[in-house]
Design a protein with these regions (language model features):
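An acidic, Gly/Ser/Thr/Pro-rich helix-cap/linker signature
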Residues: 20-88, 93
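Sec-dependent signal peptide recognition
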Residues: 3-10
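Hydrophobic h-region of N-terminal signal peptides that target proteins for export
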Residues: 12-20
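Short, functionally critical alpha-helical segments immediately adjacent to catalytic or ligand/cofactor-binding
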Residues: 89-106, 166-171, 268-271, 339-343, ...
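Catalytic cores of secreted or luminal carbohydrate-active enzymes
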Residues: 203-225, 295
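Extracellular LysM carbohydrate-binding repeats and other cell-envelope/extracellular binding modules
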Residues: 271-306, 335-363
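Substrate-binding clefts and substrate-entry loops adjacent to catalytic sites
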Residues: 56-68, 103-110, 118-161, 165, ...
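Primarily a LysM-type cell-wall glycan-binding module
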Residues: 232-264, 309-333, 346, 351-355
């Protein structure tokens, strides 16, 4: 139950920034005030409330499911909240990420969308996110959130400054939204665009906006919170929980982990954008963002050698037919054990086109 309290306290506090606890409680408790305020955040009319009954019921019945899915997200949510506030977007847009990925940093869809904001590769690259053999910044919490919020602001301007249109364009694409509006004879009202018979928009998009608004309403509904013994909520401050390090290419993540007393696997949870346990190779002056728990920052400053220079570089080798770890180790003048260690291999079996990281000693 403590986790449930913590989870809902965090989610409901997402609609406030820098609020005192007493102000927060009265704000949430006034359900008559909350619903219009939330709808206004999406530029929606009050009559849209009638659309939400089914979605709200489904979400309310799945409270435990959401708890289990998001209990590892406490580190990320305050960061997203802060960034939303800094960009001047409605705080309800936290729930866009919830619907997109359930706050799973490495979420991957069957259509190749990835990350907490579920960017497709081409969209991500157009927004300045780097994707290559070594890194996928769609899984970088900070950079992907900045890109998503910037993209939503762009869509807001393109759609005539209507947030509900921007949200739907984020899901189905701006071009697809324009086509729907054209088919509706230029009518941009939500009731028209969500028409179940005319089906101007794909079913996924019609449900998408409903889910986001419903979640905003549910997790700020005083009766729902009271019925779940969650009426006493502590407003968790919108403080950053991760510190950003600027480290140069080639640095092993294991060194960073050791300097702050974390396991490599624990550090990777905050840095899923790196595909391997080292920073991508590249120019000596290129830097990458590495994230650590904020409370570990002083340890890092004490223990990490900022003048560290890797004594080896890394390249990728694609396994060809007939190759073995023995032949590859000989080709690159390394050892089988080193190849296993760097690539996390538990045995010597390889598959064609498998990518292996090869450490190359610098001369």
């Amino acid at each position: 139950m403590k986790k449930l309290h913590k989870f809902f306290a965090l989610l409901t506090s997402a609609l406030l920034t820098n609020a005192h606890a007493s102000e927060y409680y009265s704000f949430v408790a006034s359900s008559e005030f909350m619903a219009p305020k939330i709808l206004q955040s999406f530029d929606l009319e009050l009559d849209f409330l009638g659309e939400q009954d089914e979605q709200r019921a489904a979400i309310e019945s799945s409270a435990q499911y959401f708890l289990k899915r998001f209990e590892n997200s406490y580190t990320f949510i305050p960061i997203i909240r802060n960034m939303i506030a800094q960009e001047g977007l409605p705080q309800e847009f936290l729930f866009v990420a919830m619907v997109e990925s359930e706050f799973i940093i490495n979420a991957q869809s069957s259509k190749r969308a990835s990350g907490i904001w579920q960017f497709m590769p081409n969209t991500a690259k157009s927004l300045g996110l780097e994707i290559n053999d070594y890194i996928d910044e769609r899984k970088d919490l900070i950079k992907s959130t900045r890109a998503a919020l910037g993209y939503l602001k762009f869509l807001y301007e393109q759609t005539g400054q209507q947030w509900y249109l921007a949200v739907m364009a984020y899901n189905c694409g701006y071009g697809r939204l324009l086509k729907a509006i054209e088919q509706a004879d230029g009518d941009t009202s939500l009731n028209t665009l969500l028409d179940e018979e005319k089906q101007y928009l794909p079913p996924e998009t019609r449900n998408y906006i409903r889910k986001i608004v419903a979640m905003s309403l549910v997790f700020n509904d005083a009766d729902f919170l009271k019925n779940n013994n969650l009426e006493y909520l502590l407003n968790r401050g919108a403080t950053d929980t991760l510190a950003t390090l600027k480290l140069k290419s080639g640095v092993p993540l294991g060194l960073v982990a050791n300097s702050i007393g974390l396991s490599l696997n624990e550090l990777k949870k905050y840095n899923m954008h790196f595909k391997y346990a080292f920073l991508p190779p590249g120019p000596a002056d290129k830097e990458y963002n590495v994230y650590i728990p904020y409370e570990k920052l002083s340890l890092f400053r004490q223990n990490f050698d900022t003048n560290y220079k890797p004594n080896s570089a890394f390249i990728l080798h694609k396994v060809q037919k007939g190759e073995t770890l023995t032949s590859i180790s000989r080709q690159y003048k390394t050892t089988i054990n080193e190849l296993k260690r760097v690539n996390g291999l538990k045995n010597s079996f390889l598959s064609i086109n498998q990518k292996l990281v090869i450490p190359i000693l610098k001369t």
